Amino acid sequence: MGKKSRVKTQKSGSGAAAAVSPKEMLNLISELLQKCSNPNSTPGREWEEYVQIRGLVEKIRKKQRGLSVVFDGKREDYFPELMEWCKENGASTDGFELVEFPEEGFGLKATREIKAEELFLWVPRKLLMTVESAKGSVLGPLYSQDRILQAMGNITLAFHLLCERADPNSFWLPYIKTLPNEYDTPLYFNEDEVQYLQSTQAILDVFSQYKNTARQYAYFYKVIQTHPNANKLPLKDSFTFDDYRWAVSSVMTRQNQIPTEDGSRVTLALIPLWDMCNHTNGLITTGYNLEDDRCECVALQDFKSGEQIYIFYGTRSNAEFVIHNGFFFENNLHDRVKIKLGVSKSDRLYAMKAEVLARAGIPTSSVFALHVTEPPISAQLLAFLRVFCMNEDELKGHLIGDHAIDKIFTLGNSEFPVSWENEIKLWTFLEARASLLLKTYKTTVEDDNKVLEQPDMTFHSAMAIKLRRVEKEILEKALKSASDNRKLYSKNSEEGTPLPKYEASNIAFVENSVADSKLPVVLKSLDDEEVKLQEAITISEITENGFLNDKDLLPNGTKSENDSFLAEDNQQETGNAKDFCS
């Protein structure tokens, strides 16, 4: 989170582009909105659409050159002011300092010994930028009228940030001046750097992120120019794409969920000082103390004086880190690759499979994950694959009979196979699927290693290549695991090994050995996509206002199967208004 800015943004008023007529700009904005509001692009033509959208954005950026607002000097010049501001307003500032590290950029360095689980950092609510503080700001009147802002807290925070940045008297200015001028998310990649992500499992999310950001910008550009409640916003005379990209990136890399003051629900917040901590493997050690009304963080481990203080951001994959945080984390224990699976409606046994899956709380089509750790599949994916590969008799056994419910509960437990034949089928299927996915890449792991040795490799290019390399490494591990399991269960079948037996009365309490999951599966939170089905704005409402042509677009989140409360970046916000921005 403390990653330094690498490229200097042009200062307002210096070398500004020639004046562009409002009509000319509105025409370009309308063209961009129309292009970004088209239905899903034809499979295989996503790159073509991305290049077209990018071309329009670059035209707009060229005409807006020199109009973006940035601060004089370097962000680190404002660190003393940030520390003083935090101290004056009740945040902890003792025991650490803000410094630049060789690998991660800016972060917190311990100035004394800090013990594991010691409370070393707290930030009171008054310092946080939240959706609630946005409602009470100059943005409030527009927020009260705009359905998109109401539905999407992350966009509200982005505009809150922009408005406060433009106000020389803003309470949060000491914080805002320490934010990077630019970020390392794919929104800042050039076209050649994005090319390195071609054929990866993450590329569609990269395309979607860019398309969504461009659409949001075009929509709000028109809102700011035409909506009566936007008249007093300090953005009316200058709202550039670079401004919006900076704001959404600041929020995307930093936003967290905190409880509202009464504790009845959660809201999004930017947390000054705390968001300078960089990530490492571990456990969530940040929470919110409602009694003292402040965000608190205890030490993840012992830190000696002079060492960098790390926190754990949550169980994110490297695709999520690259797309939403702008860095690649080596040796990520929670890394995974998305895999889309579904039962075909043309399957003769579709109805029975759908019913068994429904009883287990699993949809017939979803996005799962292959994990870097062993075993590579979660309890939910194991359950899905077992049902996917069941024959008619096995399906009947899970639908009718005295022990049908017990069998549903064991679907996600690796210790209780449905049958040896079923187990062989599912691992054979997974082996074939992983093999097919590997064949979609244009390079091998060895090829990627050679490219990474090139001395002129840009930071963004290296990050993209590392991501595509680790995807292949995960798929190769999954392929080997599937092959080993297929051979094991084939041997059990050939030798006539009896299936493991279980006590029906105790089955719901059996701990699952797959991905640290526990039964029953039906009580587990399954998948990324389920969260995104919540809709705050219907398709009909959007089309009536001309935001979309006829249907919603792909989700832009890469949310994991398991979420953390405070340290996750709340990509569900995008899902809450998926018709507009997903």
From Swiss-Prot:
Gene3D superfamilies cross-referenced by the UniProt entry: Rubisco LSMT, substrate-binding domain (3.90.1420.10), set domain protein methyltransferase, domain 1 (3.90.1410.10)
EC number(s) recorded for this UniProt protein: 2.1.1.85
SET domain span: 94-314
Top-level lineage group: Eukaryota
Start and end residues of each stretch annotated as Disordered: 550-582
Keyword Transmembrane helix: no
Class of the enzyme per the UniProt entry, highest EC level: transferase
UniProt cross-references to CDD domains, sorted A to Z: SET_SETD3
Gene Ontology CC: cytoplasm
A single BP term in Gene Ontology: actin modification
Molecular function as annotated in GO: actin binding; histone H3K36 methyltransferase activity; protein-L-histidine N-tele-methyltransferase activity; transcription coactivator activity
Matches recorded under Pfam families: Rubis-subs-bind, SET
Protein keywords: Actin-binding, Cytoplasm, Methyltransferase, S-adenosyl-L-methionine, Transferase
Main localization of the protein described in the UniProt heading: cytoplasm
Catalytic reaction list: L-histidyl-[protein] + S-adenosyl-L-methionine = N(tele)-methyl-L-histidyl-[protein] + S-adenosyl-L-homocysteine + H(+)
Binding site for S-adenosyl-L-methionine: R75, E104, G105, F106, R254, D275, M276, C277, N278, H279, N325, G326, F327
Domain text: The SET domain specifically recognizes and binds actin, suggesting that it does not accommodate substrates diverging from actin.
Sequence similarity: Belongs to the class V-like SAM-binding methyltransferase superfamily. SETD3 actin-histidine methyltransferase family.
Main function: Protein-histidine N-methyltransferase that specifically mediates 3-methylhistidine (tele-methylhistidine) methylation of actin at 'His-73'. Does not have protein-lysine N-methyltransferase activity and probably only catalyzes histidine methylation of actin.
Protein name, entry field: Actin-histidine N-methyltransferase
